[in-house]
A protein has these predicted regions:
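Short glycine-rich loop/turn motifs that provide flexible caps or phosphate-binding loops at active sites
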Residues: 6, 48, 78, 119-122
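Short, hydrophobic/glycine-enriched beta-strand segments
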Residues: 2-8
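Core catalytic region of metal-dependent phosphoesterases/phosphodiesterases
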Residues: 2, 15-113, 176-178
């Protein structure tokens, strides 16, 4: 069993938001082909953000169907473009009602895979300095803490923790040098 990660799929099977304008020609088929070559049913695939361009959860079915039909268990985390994201309960209910069985979410919670705890959150741009950015960063830090604590409480403190984030946790501005 292996763990894979891929983010920023920006799927748009139900909406007209083609990614070929960014040079992503035929990218859905390329994702599918590579996924089928590498991932098997017992593997875990982490999708830390920007999964779908949809604005509402009820419009995401075709995007979820695409990954549901690929092998492996999928765990999604929120990205900055996942405007369809809702409460954990609503998202899980949607998956259940649509019979999408091998997908789940990390959102103030955790997941156990083999001997690992999977935790995470979206994160935020740590270099941004506005008041709203500060609030978002503080909230995301709390979500990360909740996710890690949840994993330790549910699965034990002796297991290694894999943390997923949509925004990399950079601690300094590399554009300034040094």
């Amino acid at each position: 069993m292996s763990i894979y990660a891929i983010s920023d799929l920006h799927l748009s099977f139900n909406t007209n938001k083609p990614m070929d304008i960014f040079g992503w020609e035929n990218y859905e088929e390329r994702i599918k082909t590579n996924w089928l070559e590498k991932v098997n049913e017992k593997d875990l695939v982490l999708l830390p953000g920007d999964f779908s361009w949809e604005m509402k959860l009820e419009n995401t079915y075709k995007d979820f169907e695409f990954i549901n039909n690929l092998p492996g268990k999928k765990l999604l985390l929120k990205g900055n473009h996942d405007l369809w994201w809702s409460t954990l309960k609503k998202m899980r209910t949607f998956l259940e009602e649509e019979n999408l069985k091998n997908i789940d979410f990390i959102y103030n919670n955790s997941y156990e895979f083999e001997s690992y705890i999977i935790a995470g959150t979206r994160g935020w741009n740590l270099i941004a300095e506005g008041e709203e950015d500060k609030k978002i960063k503080e909230r995301e830090l709390l979500r990360l803490e909740n996710s890690i604590k949840n994993g330790i409480e549910k699965y034990g403190k002796d297991k290694p923790i894999i943390v997923c984030m949509h925004y990399p946790p950079l601690l300094k501005d590399f554009n300034k040098g040094g």
